């Protein structure tokens, strides 16, 4: 766990410095009149990362963006869950690659790497270091003025780098539709294959309501979120939000370095967050550009599930802090 904490401490300043530099750079470009800010779709955040699988630049509502045409979107994330006995720290890096030669808007290939340091009692026989190597493709289609359809497909190797059997391979996918009743209300319905042992498939259902430019209510299962605008200087917006949801992952590993097994971690969480992002048009909550999020929250209903022994271990409640950025 000390290794994971050190990794988190080193990584968090990198995230913050990168974002600060990106904010300064973006503000300067906007003042010079060279940036075009598009509109996009951002799914609920958290370790149910499958909902984040559709990159913002894949949205057909997005206009051309000169800054995004010059570089590939990169995402960074660092999270630490503080518990005296079973804490964990994780860091994540992902890159999105648009397939420009296919069609407009292009499908997006997303490549990711996640490292998790997990602290558990020695009697569990769980390695401290767990890794997730992922690749996937996502696409968005506008059927008409009211309907958009999103599809995604991906594969992931989640392992301690010792067990690379079928226990470690996870396949993900999803299909859901969005119906915009008006500029301020949209409805979402579909399902996502998580690749997790405890949650193979979950529904995605709910609505997003924005009664005015300063308030946005995302009542979308499995991660609802209520947002309030704090400040808007014309180029960037600062939001505060309250969110809930589930998080977790499944890995293949070698128990006591000899027996192939499968481990699933899951939790529920309630978080308070701050978000800094480029300003968009009134009534359009999702935009492309450099973003930063800082979350602090309470994590409960934490469980470890072991496939071979068909047993579960309940973990103590914990506090969580999370830094993330996309630029």
Provide a role label for each language-model segment.
Residues 1-69:
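Cleavable N-terminal export/targeting peptides
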Residues 60-71, 99-108, 142-148, 183-184, ...:
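Short loop/turn motifs that connect adjacent beta-strands in outer-membrane beta-barrel proteins
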Residues 74-78, 109-113, 151-153, 187-189, ...:
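Membrane-embedded beta-strand positions of outer-membrane beta-barrel proteins
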Residues 78-84, 113-119, 155-161, 191-197, ...:
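Transmembrane beta-strands of outer-membrane beta-barrel pores
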Residues 97-101, 139-141, 179, 193, ...:
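Residue-level signature of outer-membrane beta-barrel architecture
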Residues 125, 236-305, 311:
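Outer membrane beta-barrel transmembrane domains
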Residues 204-208, 272-274, 313-327:
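Outer-membrane beta-barrel "beta-signal"
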